């Protein structure tokens, strides 16, 4: 049994110093748990902060925006509006498609939201049109969330209809089954179909109308149960040739008889194998393609999901003909991997720099090894806690660990420095470890809990920003707590066994030179400190001026929300006049795409034209531009966007909107630009009056760029004004008119062809190639009640009007969204102020409400809570320090160091040209926890000297400053060098890390210079005030 030494010191470290085996095994357990946790942690770009979002898409080919709104969107919205936990509901009704996006509260599980949505769709089914070709389809993805992978499938030998069919049945379904895949959407889908193009003249010559033909086709192609015959010994299943499966089958179909002669479909129509929707198209670079956009499920390991898809691709490609080519054009995990790898390198660099600082100051290999062990042990042990808390390895958690590198070594340095001091005085290492650790234990606890207290307010931040930084704060707090445990257990134990008087006194040329250097620095600091202590009011003036300067700089500095990252992908929207046709839009888009591909920074692109669940109107096309890797291009993404937009001006009649794809997606709708501002009214008329006025005002605002809107009410409309009296006399109903028009111009899906693998549609339309434009309406024929064929022009007049291309709702009311980018050298805060001012100057009526959306709304919430967050951090730290010191005064002295850090951080941001965004705010909050360490170390030793050695406050604080100068300088440099790699980072995702590094470095430099002088002066001031208060005579007793 080990004999306990008589020295009763050691405090909480005593047991661990005296039991080295138990201490070592405890640390090994922490290390192993961390390694296992690291291997099991998922990898992502950022913490999981997605709002539970579900998109409901309903296709109704041929329907106008007004019909889609009233017949589909409105009934669905009424049902969705009754769901609990719904945060926001936005819808867009365009020609042939209704898209409703439902965003739920952060706390609501996505599976619960899914059940609510399914129930609401079921309730609305009876209210939807009976001829709806497809039921509403919902998907558990955010439409604004960019895909993790984009595949392009092309073929030089096969038609796109066959390629699409193979992609849908052999590729898309298999990929959808991969764990982590949320949705696979097919853009440019040319789904095979039989297209029946009626010849209007032939139909009229035979005395037929389109409704008769539609009914004949529908009745001729059926697929239903027929029963079976069950005899005494055998059972026979009944089957029939009731299915027509090819264009040849339909050509021979008899649709009517005239004078005993059969009228076949081929006599009055052209029947061909074609695409179900001829107004959809996609391209990979310049080649027609079927594009697969693969989106993730919320909360999955995006790296693992992408890897699983890539692993199965070779097998999927083998199932396709050799003439079909499959390429991965976009892989967002490439930049995620690169960004995480860069942060991991910066983490290792920070560790190396911190170890270097330790050696420079301690000048002793054993003394350097001890805190160097504490750093990786604390960081690796944190991974175990991250795993159990459900966190991931992402940019923010790795940034927290990088910053923690400078924090976790502080405690070990303070312990080693104090123990070494006693060893150098001649005490035995074990006694020195017990005495030094016991003396410094309270300081370590004070430093740790006061620093963790600063992070507590981050845990209570609300909404998306709070969820975003929760992992950052908890990861950092866990690393700090583990470092405190290591510093109070392993560090003193190693000191007792690795340090000795001889090893500490042993010097080489470097250590001797550095010792002389530090002695001179401390001596010079002592002289300056005496001068400052003898002129306290000047120092107090400097301290007070830093507070005023902090407030002034906060008011002046540009403010933003989240750094714009260069992820190598640009999302583009090409907008043409509202009356543009599909073919003309496709031609314009391909011209622009060809020029984009000539840019030296562009590697590839995909483009799409048509109306689907993402693209709302025919006059807008989507582009996804993939840039070359950052190492292969000289420019960052803002410069490339500027150049591409300037290039697009050579194409008249189109406008190109570009925005970089970001890891953080808060919006719920695909937008042309980065930020959105919504107007909501009770009627479309109010919006049609005020949206153009506000748009004109904002387009003249210098703080804004690329101002546009989804308000489009200048689409051409051919209004069929039916004389109801005349129609009634002829026995023609409005239903007959609508059916005739739908049959002719709606790409109407009139029948279904069933196969073993898929289902295909029969599409009915008029062949308008011979009579384009409004003249085609003259070919419409209807059947009167007595069987006479009546031209449409007999009972109706055609009027050309303007109408909406889409109808947008927000929470069931008409809305319009104005999208914008921030111009030039302006900040998001300045842009928001400019919009608010323009709205005020325009004096909008009270029944029009306005609201920022997405990232801009989150920015306003974050900005409004910044001061409260900082105040909460200060109050939390004051409470912790007050409890630890049992004093109201000493915490104030410690907190007096904070303005110096604020000044340094804000000045550094302004000098670097950075905005005060949420990343920088986190840096400032961390500085609050760091810079007070200097004051704690000074005040702890000053109070101990007053209490134990009977020193005066002046002598006590002077001695404390000199004794703690070296560990203060060492810990500050360690924290500074831990943040330096973040400030100097240039790789992928550097934009995210840069503000944090700039804040930390700037704040630490400024606070280190000032607090070494202001803290002792303020300590003496408050000590004097406290003594004067205690010396006041007691109140005399009343007689």
Swiss-Prot record:
GO terms for molecular function: xenobiotic transmembrane transporter activity. Disulfide bonds: none annotated. One of its GO terms (cellular component) is plasma membrane. It holds the Pfam family ACR_tran. Gene3D superfamilies: Multidrug efflux transporter AcrB pore domain, Multidrug efflux transporter AcrB pore domain like, Multidrug efflux transporter AcrB TolC docking domain, DN and DC subdomains, Multidrug efflux transporter AcrB transmembrane domain. InterPro entries: AcrB_DN_DC_subdom, Acrflvin-R, Multidrug-R_MdtB. Signal peptide: none annotated. The chain crosses the membrane at residues 16-36, 342-362, 373-393, 396-416, 440-460, 472-492, 537-557, 863-883, 888-908, 911-931, 968-988, 1002-1022. It is a multi-pass membrane protein. Keywords: Cell inner membrane, Cell membrane, Membrane, Transmembrane, Transmembrane helix, Transport. SUPFAM superfamilies: Multidrug efflux transporter AcrB pore domain, PN1, PN2, PC1 and PC2 subdomains, Multidrug efflux transporter AcrB TolC docking domain, DN and DC subdomains, Multidrug efflux transporter AcrB transmembrane domain. It is found in: Cell inner membrane. It comes from the Bacteria. Belongs to the resistance-nodulation-cell division (RND) (TC 2.A.6) family. MdtB subfamily. Part of a tripartite efflux system composed of MdtA, MdtB and MdtC. MdtB forms a heteromultimer with MdtC. This is Multidrug resistance protein MdtB. It comes from Serratia proteamaculans (strain 568).
């Amino acid at each position: 049994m080990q004999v306990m030494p008589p020295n009763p010191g050691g405090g909480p470290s005593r047991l661990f110093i005296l039991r080295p085996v138990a201490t070592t095994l405890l640390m090994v357990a922490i290390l192993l748990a961390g390694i296992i946790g690291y291997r099991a942690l998922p990898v992502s770009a950022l913490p999981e902060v997605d709002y539970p979002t579900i998109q409901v898409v309903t296709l109704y080919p041929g329907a106008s925006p007004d019909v889609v709104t009233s017949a589909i969107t409105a009934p669905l919205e009424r049902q969705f509006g009754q769901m609990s936990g719904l945060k926001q509901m936005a819808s867009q009704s365009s020609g042939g498609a209704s898209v409703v996006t439902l965003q739920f509260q952060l706390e609501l599980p996505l599976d619960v939201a899914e059940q609510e949505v399914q129930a609401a769709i079921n309730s609305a089914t009876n209210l939807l049109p009976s001829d709806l070709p497809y039921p509403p389809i919902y998907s558990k993805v955010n439409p604004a969330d960019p895909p993790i992978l984009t595949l392009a499938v092309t073929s030089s030998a096969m038609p796109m209809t066959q390629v699409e069919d193979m992609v849908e049945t052999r590729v898309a379904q298999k990929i959808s089954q991969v764990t982590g895949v949320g949705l696979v959407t097919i853009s440019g889908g040319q789904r095979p179909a039989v297209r029946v193009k009626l010849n209007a003249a032939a139909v009229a010559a035979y005395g037929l109308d389109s409704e008769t033909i539609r009914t004949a086709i529908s009745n001729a192609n059926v697929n239903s149960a027929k029963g079976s015959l069950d005899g005494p010994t055998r059972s026979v299943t009944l089957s029939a040739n009731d299915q027509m499966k090819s264009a040849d089958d339909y050509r021979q179909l008899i649709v009517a008889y005239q004078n005993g002669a059969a009228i076949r479909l081929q006599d009055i129509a052209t029947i061909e194998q074609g695409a179900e929707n001829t107004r959809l198209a996609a391209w990979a670079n310049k080649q027609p393609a079927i594009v697969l956009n693969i989106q993730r499920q919320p909360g999955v390991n995006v790296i693992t999901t992408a890897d699983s898809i890539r692993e199965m691709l070779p097998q999927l490609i083998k199932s396709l003909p050799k003439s079909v080519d499959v390429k991965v054009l976009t892989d967002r995990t490439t930049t995620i991997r690169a960004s995480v790898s860069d942060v991991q390198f910066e983490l290792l660099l920070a560790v190396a720099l911190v170890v270097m600082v330790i050696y420079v100051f301690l000048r002793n290999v054993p003394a350097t090894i001890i805190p160097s062990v504490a750093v990786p042990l604390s960081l690796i042990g944190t991974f175990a806690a991250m795993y159990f808390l459900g966190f991931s390895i992402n940019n923010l958690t790795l940034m927290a660990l990088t910053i923690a590198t400078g924090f976790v070594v502080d405690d070990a340095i303070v312990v080693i420095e104090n123990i070494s001091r006693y060893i150098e005085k001649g005490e035995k290492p074990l006694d020195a470890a017990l005495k030094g650790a016991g003396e410094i234990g309270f300081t370590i606890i004070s430093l740790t809990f006061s620093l963790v207290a600063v992070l507590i307010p981050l845990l209570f931040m609300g909404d998306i920003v709070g969820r975003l930084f929760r992992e950052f704060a908890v990861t950092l707090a866990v690393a700090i707590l583990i470092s405190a445990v290591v510093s109070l257990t392993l560090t003193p134990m190693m000191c007792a066994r690795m340090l000795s008087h001889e090893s500490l006194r042993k010097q080489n040329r470097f250590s001797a030179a550095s010792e002389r250097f530090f002695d001179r620095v401390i001596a010079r600091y002592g002289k300056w400190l005496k001068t400052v202590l003898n002129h306290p009011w000047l120092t107090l003036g400097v301290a007070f001026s830093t507070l005023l300067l902090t407030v002034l700089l906060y008011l002046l500095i540009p403010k933003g929300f989240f750094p714009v990252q260069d992820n190598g992908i640009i999302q583009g929207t090409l907008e043409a006049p509202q009356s543009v046709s599909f073919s003309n839009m496709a031609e314009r888009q391909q011209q622009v795409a060809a020029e984009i591909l000539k840019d030296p920074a562009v590697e590839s692109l995909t483009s799409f034209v048509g109306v689907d669940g993402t693209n709302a109107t025919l006059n807008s096309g989507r582009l996804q531009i993939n840039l070359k890797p950052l190492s292969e291009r000289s420019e960052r993404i803002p410069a490339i966007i500027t150049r591409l937009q300037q290039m697009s001006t050579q194409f008249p009649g189109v406008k190109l909107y570009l925005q970089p794809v970001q890891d953080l997606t808060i919006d719920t709708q695909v937008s042309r630009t980065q930020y959105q501002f919504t107007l909501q009214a009770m009627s479309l008329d109010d919006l049609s009056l005020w949206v153009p006025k506000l748009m004109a005002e904002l387009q003249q605002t210098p703080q804004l760029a690329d101002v546009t809107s989804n308000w489009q009410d200048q689409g051409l409309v051919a209004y069929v004004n039916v004389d109801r009296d005349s129609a009634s006399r002829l026995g023609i109903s409005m239903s007959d008119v609508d059916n005739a028009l739908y049959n002719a111009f709606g790409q109407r899906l009139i029948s279904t062809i069933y196969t073993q693998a898929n289902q295909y549609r029969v599409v009915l339309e008029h062949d308008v190639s011979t009579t384009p434009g409004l003249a085609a309406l003259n070919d419409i024929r209807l059947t009167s009640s007595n069987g006479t064929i009546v031209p449409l022009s007999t009972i109706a007049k055609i009027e050309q009007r303007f109408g909406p291309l889409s109808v947008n709702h927000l929470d069931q009311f008409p809305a319009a969204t104005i999208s914008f980018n921030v111009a030039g050298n302006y900040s998001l805060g300045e842009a928001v102020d400019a919009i608010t001012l323009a709205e005020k100057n325009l004096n909008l009526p009270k029944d029009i409400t306005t609201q920022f959306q997405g990232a801009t709304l989150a920015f306003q919430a974050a900005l409004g809570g910044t001061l409260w967050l900082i105040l909460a951090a200060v109050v939390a730290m004051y409470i912790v320090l007050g409890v630890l010191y049992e004093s109201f005064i000493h915490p104030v002295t410690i907190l007096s160091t904070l303005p110096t850090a604020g000044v340094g951080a804000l000045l550094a941001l302004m000098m670097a040209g950075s905005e005060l965004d949420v990343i920088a705010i986190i840096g400032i909050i961390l500085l609050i926890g760091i810079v007070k360490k200097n004051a704690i170390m000074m005040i702890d030793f000053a109070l101990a000297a007053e209490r134990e050695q009977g020193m005066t406050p002046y002598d006590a604080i002077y001695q404390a400053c000199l004794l703690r100068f070296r560990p203060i300088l060492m810990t500050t440099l360690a924290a500074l060098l831990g943040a330096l790699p973040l400030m100097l980072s240039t790789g992928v995702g550097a934009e995210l890390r840069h503000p944090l590094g700039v804040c930390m470095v700037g704040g630490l430099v400024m606070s280190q210079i000032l607090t070494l002088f202001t803290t002792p002066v303020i300590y003496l001031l408050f000590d004097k005030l406290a003594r004067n208060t205690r010396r006041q005579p007691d109140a005399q007793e009343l007689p």
